[in-house]
Design a protein with these regions (language model features):
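Conserved SGNH/GDSL esterase-like catalytic core that processes O-acyl groups on lipids
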Residues: 98-189
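Structural recognition of the beta-strand scaffold that forms the well-ordered cores
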Residues: 87-91, 116-121, 169-174, 206-211, ...
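Acidic/His-rich structured neighborhood in mature extracellular/periplasmic domains
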Residues: 162-243, 249
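Catalytic His-Asp segment of secreted/periplasmic serine-dependent ester chemistry enzymes
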Residues: 226-329
Length: 363
């Protein structure tokens, strides 16, 4: 009988304990019964996911928001894939001719960098026309090429021939000047870039975009009325188009801001004298400004420290050109007022610099 009472007491105690457990708060029950887990992880979630995020959503992005647009800039410094000679090809028109055919080689030479420079040229050629000629194999290009400081010009070439001629380190594209500020005309740019990359022998080729310049204020160019025949309107529209292009065309590594450099230079004592006919660049300091922009944009080297000056460009003009280019590479789509160059010098040397340009003949 005594044993029977003990058993009943034990059973009663067990029932009481169970009743107490059933009254615990839910979190206390989970705490007392859960398995040991890795400290710092939330039980019940996949250890590989961040608690609180929706599975299947990249934890690095905020669901429901668009990724931040790329900030427009010059490319990262481009280097020679062969370790010796930097090879640059422009797919362009007369505005790429203005920028790279006359002084760019000498600037690189003064910096200690050997270059080969090519320009696939058709006057006034648009993005759409470049793509059409690529697709149909038209041999309508002049292939201008600078090797060892000597320029040659071969007519009747196709775009594919120019792309495959060298193992180019950088290939640039651009829009024709009249359409440069009309972003709707850029719709085939990605297709043109895809063609270039598919046919380039250097699979790591850098694609850059050449931002061209606004016309002079008194330009009579037939397409100037698209911009209300106003220089700053045209410049701002070019910047807007370049910004949108850079966001939409991820294959473009950066901008070569010749247009901003020219606009910067126009704030100097030289004023609105950077065009020879209202739209093409003035042959001497105008073209030199664009060339200075290209070398800094492609190398990241401060062009104001480069020793080269063409014989036909004065000391002061060269300083304006280099300062304008350097400022443009710092602020790609913003005009910088060249406050240090507001007054024309009383005398300005045109004596030959220590490094002279090669004779390119008539351009």
């Amino acid at each position: 009988m005594k044993i029977y009472k003990i058993v009943l007491s034990i059973a009663a105690a067990a029932i009481m304990i169970a009743a107490i457990d059933s009254c615990k708060k839910p979190e206390e029950q989970e705490e007392s019964g859960k398995e040991q887990v890795d400290p710092g992880t939330d039980p019940g979630t996949d250890p590989g996911t961040d608690p609180g995020t929706d599975p299947g959503t990249d934890p690095g992005t905020d669901p429901g928001t668009d990724p931040e647009p790329r900030v427009i800039s010059i490319p990262k410094p481009v280097t020679a894939s062969d370790g010796t000679t930097l090879k640059i090809l422009a797919i362009g028109n007369s505005f790429s001719q203005d920028a790279i055919e006359q002084y760019l080689y000498e600037l690189f030479k003064a910096s200690g960098q050997e270059t080969i420079i090519g320009n696939m040229y058709i006057g006034g050629c648009t993005i759409d026309t470049h793509l059409a000629k690529a697709n149909n194999g038209a041999k309508d290009y002049e292939y201008r090429k600078v090797v060892d400081g000597v320029k040659t010009n071969t007519v009747g070439k196709g775009l594919l021939e120019g792309i495959k001629d060298e193992n180019w380190d950088v290939i640039t594209v651009q829009q024709a000047s009249g359409s440069s500020g009309i972003y709707s005309t850029y719709s085939n740019l990605n297709a043109l870039i895809d063609y270039v990359k598919a046919n380039a022998s250097n699979k790591d080729v850098v694609i850059a975009f050449h931002q061209t310049w606004a016309y002079s204020s008194n330009s009579t160019h037939a397409e100037f009325p698209k911009y209300n025949s106003d220089q700053m309107t045209m410049y701002n529209m070019i910047c807007d188009a370049a910004t949108q292009m850079f966001r939409d065309c991820e294959s473009v590594a950066g901008i070569i801001p010749s247009g901003t450099a020219i606009q910067n230079a126009r704030t100097s004592y030289l004023g609105d004298t950077f065009n020879r006919d209202g739209y093409h660049l003035e042959i001497n300091y105008g073209r030199f400004t664009a060339a200075c922009t290209w070398i800094e944009a492609l190398t990241g080297q401060d062009v104001t420290t480069n020793t080269y000056r063409p014989a036909t460009v004065s000391d002061s003009q060269a300083k304006v050109a280099k300062a304008a280019a350097h400022a443009a590479c710092q602020k790609v789509i913003e005009v910088t007022d060249l406050v240090d160059f507001k007054t024309a010098p009383t005398s300005d040397s045109l004596s030959l610099p220590s490094v002279q340009e090669e004779d390119f003949g008539v351009i």
